[in-house]
Amino acid sequence: MYAYDPGNPREFIDGQVYAVGFTWDKDNDPAFPPDSNGAVSVLVFDSFKGKPTWASVGPFLSQYAKLYPFMDSLFPPGLGDPQVYQKNIRAFESVLGLPIEDPRYMPVTRDMSRDKRKVLLAWIKAGAPG
């Protein structure tokens, strides 16, 4: 299976989700009735070529603040404020730098593209300038 940049169809959320159906030769065997739930969800991310500046990362971090308002209670005044990252550089570097398989990986929903994560980490490593 191959996937290509979907071109940001959902604007504020990375990528596009596709359901891919499949069958196998046992589907014709009465002992193995077809399963109508036989599908694989595939998340294909759009590319992101922003620079490691607040102007580039701010819009998608503000979207995360809207999607996950609970995080604002952990980091007042909220994820949409660059000072939050400036004050918590080590914490954000550690969770954003983990392998995606790690349960502590952020965002926990695994819905941030590799490109945006790379730019975000570069911005944080630069001191999260506002």
Feature-to-residue mapping (PLM):
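Aromatic- and Gly/Pro-enriched helix-to-coil junctions and flexible linker segments
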Residues: 2-130
